[in-house]
């Protein structure tokens, strides 16, 4: 029980944004990704804190398990159902603008009584830069007329680079999830091919033995030969 509680606490710590000790204001925006095993006949929900007037993108994929499908729902902090999907292998949904509070994401495998599912999902927030921090940084430098390159150009270049790097990380994460799903599917297909190949070989051997026995009976004379 202690190990299970520690695992749940670690999962929540990885998913929920960290709140600074002794700091005021809303929690900082953080992207998150998580992979978990959803047992057969079970439903599992996660909660993600979000600030107001932001953009939240949710992507999920079923990367393992028979059928590669799951039911998905997304609820707002007020309990309003925003997204409801049934028996889907993947999905991408965007909430814009967001409400301040905890969004609820649920994955349901109740329709499956045997097969468990391996589910990957990712939460992506649009990054917003603190205007006061930007203004303070700009005031700390020399006047723009004394610089060869304007501060706005530098900030724009840095912001563009940061956005592209974040998007590259997100795309690599999704590609890794696709690769895991394809690998699991290929391994399942390999097991099926090996099983049915062995079954066919066994049937062929059985048929060959039966044919030999049948032919031997045709040539076996049961009548005694008089001497």
Swiss-Prot record:
Coiled coil location: 145-170
SMART domains xref list: EMP24_GP25L
Residue numbers covered by motif COPI vesicle coat-binding: 218-227
GO CC annotations on file: COPII-coated ER to Golgi transport vesicle; endoplasmic reticulum; endoplasmic reticulum membrane; endoplasmic reticulum-Golgi intermediate compartment; endoplasmic reticulum-Golgi intermediate compartment membrane; Golgi apparatus; plasma membrane
GOLD domain span: 43-125
Residue ranges crossing the lipid bilayer per the database entry: 195-215
Subcellular location(s) of the protein: Cell membrane; Endoplasmic reticulum membrane; Golgi apparatus, cis-Golgi network membrane; Endoplasmic reticulum-Golgi intermediate compartment membrane
Pfam families found in the cross-reference section: EMP24_GP25L
Keyword line: Cell membrane, Coiled coil, Endoplasmic reticulum, Golgi apparatus, Membrane, Protein transport, Signal, Transmembrane, Transmembrane helix, Transport
SUPFAM superfamilies: Supernatant protein factor (SPF), C-terminal domain
Superkingdom of this protein's organism: Eukaryota
Motif (COPII vesicle coat-binding): 218-219
Membrane topology: Single-pass type I membrane protein
Signal peptide region: 1-23
Membrane topology, Extracellular segments: 25-194
Segments on the Cytoplasmic face: 216-227
First-listed, main subcellular location of the protein, grouped into a coarse class: membrane
GO biological process, one term: endoplasmic reticulum to Golgi vesicle-mediated transport
Family: Belongs to the EMP24/GP25L family.
Function field: Potential role in vesicular protein trafficking, mainly in the early secretory pathway. May act as a cargo receptor at the lumenal side for incorporation of secretory cargo molecules into transport vesicles and may be involved in vesicle coat formation at the cytoplasmic side. Plays a positive role in IL-33-mediated IL-8 and IL-6 production by interacting with interleukin-33 receptor IL1RL1. Plays also a role in the modulation of innate immune signaling through the cGAS-STING pathway by interacting with RNF26.
PANTHER family xref list: TRANSMEMBRANE EMP24 DOMAIN-CONTAINING PROTEIN
Protein name as catalogued: Transmembrane emp24 domain-containing protein 1
Species of the source: Rattus norvegicus (Rat)
Underlying gene: Tmed1
């Amino acid at each position: 029980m202690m190990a299970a509680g520690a695992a749940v606490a670690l999962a929540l710590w990885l998913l929920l944004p960290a709140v600074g000790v002794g700091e005021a204001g809303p929690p900082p925006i953080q992207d998150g990704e998580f992979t978990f095993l959803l047992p057969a006949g079970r439903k599992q929900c996660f909660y993600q804190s979000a600030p107001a007037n932001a953009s939240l993108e949710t992507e999920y994929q079923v990367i393992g398990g028979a059928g590669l499908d799951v039911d998905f729902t997304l609820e707002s902090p007020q309990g309003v159902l925003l997204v409801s999907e049934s028996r889907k292998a993947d999905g991408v949904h965007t909430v814009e603008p967001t409400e301040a509070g905890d969004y609820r994401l649920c994955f349901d495998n109740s329709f499956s009584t045997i097969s468990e599912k391996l589910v990957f999902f990712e939460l992506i927030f649009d990054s917003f830069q603190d205007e006061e921090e930007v203004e303070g940084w700009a005031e700390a430098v020399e006047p723009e007329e004394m610089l060869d390159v304007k501060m706005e150009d530098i900030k724009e270049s840095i912001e563009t680079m940061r956005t592209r790097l974040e998007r590259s990380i997100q795309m690599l994460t999704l590609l890794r999830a696709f690769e895991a799903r394809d690998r699991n599917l290929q391994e399942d297909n390999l097991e099926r091919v090996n099983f049915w190949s062995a079954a066919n070989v066994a049937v062929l051997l059985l048929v060959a033995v039966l044919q030999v026995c049948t032919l031997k009976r045709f040539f076996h004379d049961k009548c005694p030969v008089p001497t």
